[in-house]
Amino acid sequence: MSSLTHFDAQGQAHMVDVAAKPATHRVAVATGRIEMQPATLALIESGTAKKGDVLGIARIAGIQAAKKTSDLIPLCHPLALTRVALAFALAEKGNAPQVVCTATVETVGPTGVEMEALTAVQVALLTIYDMCKAVDRGMRITDVHVLEKHGGKSGSYLADPQG
């Protein structure tokens, strides 16, 4: 495992200097899910939630979040993102009705977009919670992680499908 890059020789936090790194095509895919009551999933699926189109609003929130990641995470570089896409799948895993969110983020730049993909997923899922909390305060956001990343010196990463 390599050393932490966000600390200088004195142990002080700093933003990593990426000026000498080449701009390469970078892609990151992250996912997560929100578990809920069956009635809540039915509201989302039917489009009858009081606050409107839950997944449409969550998609826009996730896109906005990816673009604002460097404002939220102190040592992240501001990046010119070339693509942010969010997909939602409604499913039942065991006895847990859920919405699974997957975000794909791309750029051509000197640093990766994993944080942007993770932020997009988290904020999209938080938006679902916000829009449905009046009917289901027991929703649970879980399993947020990077599925894959490509580009840069460290190459590709694929999460273990077994978890």
UniProtKB/Swiss-Prot annotation:
Q: Which residues bind substrate?
A: 75-77, 115-116
Q: Which UniProt keywords apply?
A: Lyase, Molybdenum cofactor biosynthesis
Q: Which domain of life is it from?
A: Bacteria
Q: Which family does it belong to?
A: Belongs to the MoaC family.
Q: Known catalysed reaction(s)?
A: (8S)-3',8-cyclo-7,8-dihydroguanosine 5'-triphosphate = cyclic pyranopterin phosphate + diphosphate
Gene Ontology MF term list: cyclic pyranopterin monophosphate synthase activity
Among InterPro entries, the record links this protein to: MoaC, MoaC_bact/euk, MoaC_sf, MoCo_biosynth_MoaA/MoaC, Mopterin_CF_biosynth-C_dom
> EC?
4.6.1.17
Which residues participate directly in catalysis?
A: 130
What does the UniProt record say this protein does? Catalyzes the conversion of (8S)-3',8-cyclo-7,8-dihydroguanosine 5'-triphosphate to cyclic pyranopterin monophosphate (cPMP).
The record ties this protein, via SUPFAM superfamilies, to: Molybdenum cofactor biosynthesis protein C, MoaC
Taken from the record, one Pfam family name reads MoaC
> Subunit arrangement?
Homohexamer; trimer of dimers.
In what pathway does it function? Cofactor biosynthesis; molybdopterin biosynthesis
Q: Which PANTHER family match?
A: CYCLIC PYRANOPTERIN MONOPHOSPHATE SYNTHASE, MOLYBDOPTERIN COFACTOR SYNTHESIS PROTEIN A
Please cite one Gene Ontology biological process associated with this protein.
Mo-molybdopterin cofactor biosynthetic process
- What top-tier enzyme class does this entry carry? lyase
Q: Name it.
A: Cyclic pyranopterin monophosphate synthase
